[in-house]
Regions:
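A short secondary-structure junction signal
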Residues: 1, 7-11, 33-37, 62-68, ...
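GT-A fold catalytic core of metal-dependent nucleotide-sugar glycosyltransferases
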Residues: 1-30, 44, 53-54
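Intrinsically disordered, low-complexity boundary segments flanking structured domains
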Residues: 6-14, 38-41, 82-85, 104-111
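A glycosyltransferase accessory/donor-loop signature
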Residues: 56-200
Length: 200
């Protein structure tokens, strides 16, 4: 999973949903700009669907599941699929929760500490803590601590399998001054990319 639970979430069960369908946490402002341009989202925020607390009665009453599937089958301009569709269907029908319930963190381009009151830490974005190119980030050690106490403790960390992943590995190795490793993965990246283009 790309989400860790770090503190109690008991207070979530005491939220007053009223007529709202779900409790959500807003994503970065850039995502709202994207949604407003891509599919005319009529809302003051765009939420991340990695975390939702759903009022099942209101969800069923509004037939959200069927509507979501229908939209996904009939429209092809959704970049983030279920997340875009849910933002469209639940616009102005959600309870906005504090950031601590879904602290969105990008290992590729963020390097700030998280708040002590973080409840759910969400490793969002393309770089994940179970990937070898995500191992240099200080927050990966937190994820590894939980992995090593789980039934998956012996599952190996994922190594690059594609030229795009090798490019990430090259960049992250260089950024962390692992220059020999960076050169090694740059050569791999170049070879794999050429090989993939020749197949087309």
């Amino acid at each position: 999973s790309d989400i860790l639970c770090l503190n109690s979430f008991e207070n979530l069960f005491h939220q007053n949903f009223s007529s709202n369908i779900a409790g959500v946490v807003s994503d970065h402002d850039s995502m709202l700009n994207y949604a407003q341009k891509a599919f005319n989202l009529n809302s003051n925020y765009y939420f991340n669907s990695g975390f939702l607390i759903i009022n099942l009665i209101n969800w069923e009453k509004n037939n959200i599941s069927d509507k979501a599937i229908s939209l996904l089958l009939n429209k092809n301009n959704f970049k983030y699929y279920d997340q875009d569709v849910l933002n469209l269907l639940l616009a102005n029908k959600t309870l906005l929760l504090e950031k601590k319930y879904n602290t969105i963190y990008h290992l590729a381009d963020m390097n700030t500490p998280i708040s002590n009151d973080t409840i759910f830490l969400h490793y969002s974005g393309s770089v994940k803590p179970w990937q070898s190119w995500g191992q240099y980030h200080f927050l990966t050690s937190l994820w590894l601590k939980y992995k090593n106490n789980s039934p998956w403790k012996n599952v190996p960390i994922l190594q690059p399998q594609t030229y795009k992943q090798a490019k990430f590995m090259t960049r992250m190795s260089y950024r962390n001054k692992k220059f020999i490793k960076s050169i090694y993965w740059y050569i791999k990246y170049s070879f794999w990319k050429i090989k993939s283009k020749l197949k087309v």
